């Protein structure tokens, strides 16, 4: 069997494409006992949404606490963290905890990319951190790169989102001067029966909005569920708006659509 060396002193089948977890495990064979995964690598292991360029990056971020020397190896970006924090374990790998990882991303991300990542830490399913935990981490971080960007991102981030595209929809709507929609507002019909929990909603105007990825179009079962879901909202006298990638990629179109529906439902600009 032909072998490749992803890291010095480590061998793996040459024809295999190593997953991130496999790559991290391979590096652990030669890593120091005091090393742990951090920054982009930790965020990826946690499932935090990142730009494509970082999702595909093969270099690993490995850190140590001060006063240890940061690791130096081909394929590894070494870091030294000034303060000790309790580590997490993911897939039997030592990883920086979520709030510390978020602080570290301030040196890598900015703008909407950082807001989407922050929403990813605060997400509804498998929540990684609370707003209070991120606020505490920020208040106790000094002379760390990106603190100003982190402050700005946390101010625009929201808890309980489901996807980065949903985050972008919310940001586009709010920045256009429209009212900010609620997240995960639970809708009941006139008889008190559960209708649904849309991604975004204007409860005052009975408008429900869902972002639908490509799977909603290509999966017959999901598509049928979407049709029935729309009917439930309509029967409850709610206006149901379905948003797609085309809307997010064309912000003026998204804003015009939401603005039109708001006005139809009684909103005064």
Where do the PLM segments sit?
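Short gly/ser-rich loop at a beta-strand->alpha-helix junction or flexible surface loop bordering the NTP-binding
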Residues: 1-146, 263, 268-269
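Surface segments flanking catalytic/ligand-binding clefts of nucleic-acid enzymes
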Residues: 122-269
């Amino acid at each position: 069997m032909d072998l490749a060396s992803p890291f010095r002193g480590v061998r793996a089948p040459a024809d295999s494409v190593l997953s991130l977890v496999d790559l991290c495990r391979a590096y652990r064979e030669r890593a120091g006992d005091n090393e742990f995964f951090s920054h982009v690598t930790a965020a990826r292991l946690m499932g935090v949404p990142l730009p494509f360029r970082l999702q595909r990056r093969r270099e690993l971020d490995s850190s140590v606490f001060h006063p240890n020397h940061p690791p130096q190896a081909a394929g590894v970006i070494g870091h030294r963290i000034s303060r000790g924090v309790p580590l997490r374990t993911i897939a039997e790998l030592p990883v920086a905890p979520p709030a510390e990882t978020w602080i570290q991303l301030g040196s890598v991300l900015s703008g909407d990319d950082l807001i989407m990542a922050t929403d990813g830490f605060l997400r509804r399913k498998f929540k990684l951190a609370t707003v209070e935990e991120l606020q505490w981490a920020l208040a106790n971080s000094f002379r760390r790169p990106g603190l100003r960007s982190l402050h700005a991102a946390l101010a625009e981030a929201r808890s309980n989102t489901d996807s980065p595209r949903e985050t972008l929809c919310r940001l586009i709507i709010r920045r256009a001067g429209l009212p900010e929609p609620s997240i995960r507002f639970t809708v009941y019909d006139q008889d008190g029966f559960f209708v649904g929990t849309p991604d975004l909603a204007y409860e005052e105007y009975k408008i429900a909005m869902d972002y639908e990825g490509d799977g909603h179009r290509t999966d017959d079962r999901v598509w049928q569920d979407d049709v029935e879901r729309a009917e439930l909202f309509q029967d409850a006298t709610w206006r149901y708006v379905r948003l797609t990638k085309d809307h997010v990629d064309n912000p003026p179109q998204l804003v015009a659509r939401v603005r039109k529906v708001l006005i139809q439902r009684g909103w005064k600009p």
